[in-house]
Curated annotation (Swiss-Prot):
Pfam families: KOW, ribosomal_L24. GO terms for molecular function: rRNA binding; structural constituent of ribosome. PROSITE patterns: RIBOSOMAL_L24. Part of the 50S ribosomal subunit. The gene is rplX. One of two assembly initiator proteins, it binds directly to the 5'-end of the 23S rRNA, where it nucleates assembly of the 50S subunit. One of the proteins that surrounds the polypeptide exit tunnel on the outside of the subunit. This is Large ribosomal subunit protein uL24. One of its GO terms (cellular component) is ribonucleoprotein complex. The lineage of its organism: Bacteria, Bacillati, Mycoplasmatota, Mollicutes, Entomoplasmatales. Keywords: Ribonucleoprotein, Ribosomal protein, RNA-binding, rRNA-binding. Gene3D superfamilies: 2.30.30.30. It comes from Mesoplasma florum (strain ATCC 33453 / NBRC 100688 / NCTC 11704 / L1).
Length: 109
């Protein structure tokens, strides 16, 4: 699989599924880069008890979303973007949205 341009902390827009149109920051990316977890979106409410966590009940546990169902949020025109480019500014490599040519905020963990 090709390298993903989405990083932990980036604000993404859900583009498919029951949460379509919702925004949130990424909290986790799987090692094989196929799944992401977005804060406040697609969370499980009912949790069954397991051997490690003997107490089940109603808890908010983040669930995963396929990477193909999210797009980076463009800071300038508030659309989901599909292409990320890079520019050198002051000797540093900066990520930009190719459509609006605006810099993407640095992802904070």
């Amino acid at each position: 699989m090709s390298k993903s341009k989405i990083l932990v902390g980036d604000v993404v827009k859900v583009i498919a599924g029951s949460h379509k149109g919702e925004l949130g920051p990424i909290t986790w990316i799987s090692k094989d880069k196929k799944w992401v977890s977005v804060q406040g979106i697609n969370s499980l409410k009912h949790v069954k008890p397991s051997q490690t966590d003997s107490e089940g009940g109603i808890k908010e546990v983040p669930s995963k979303i396929n990477l193909s169902n999210v797009a980076l949020q463009d800071p300038k025109n508030k659309d989901g973007i599909s292409k990320v480019g890079y520019q050198i500014e002051d000797g540093k490599k900066v990520r930009i949205a190719k459509k609006s040519n605006s810099p993407l905020k640095k992802a904070s963990k």
